[in-house]
């Protein structure tokens, strides 16, 4: 995935995967990968400069959840597109 090459991309993927799971009941990745994204965000927290970083909380990351995030329309649209792309691959 792109976030393996650029730590700032952890933020949008965490947000999209969280939205898909908690709002749309769509699990796009394995739980272990989601947990690893959370851990990578915590580990790299001080070096991440993504503009959506303020939407994240270390408390939620440590708990391995994205349940209480206020998702902006941009994230919602991207997550919906990711869900549709995933569904096309499985059909």
Question: How would you label these PLM feature ranges?
Answer:
Residues 1-91:
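Phosphate/adenylate-binding "loop-and-lid" substructures adjacent to NTP/NAD/dNTP-binding pockets
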């Amino acid at each position: 995935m792109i976030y393996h090459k650029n730590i700032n991309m952890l933020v949008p993927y965490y947000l999209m995967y969280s939205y898909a799971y908690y709002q749309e009941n769509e699990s796009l990745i394995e739980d272990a990968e989601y947990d690893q994204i959370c851990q990578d965000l915590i580990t790299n927290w001080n070096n991440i400069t993504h503009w959506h970083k303020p939407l994240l909380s270390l408390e939620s990351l440590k708990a391995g959840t994205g349940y209480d995030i206020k998702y902006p329309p941009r994230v919602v649209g991207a997550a919906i597109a990711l869900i549709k792309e995933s569904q096309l691959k499985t059909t």
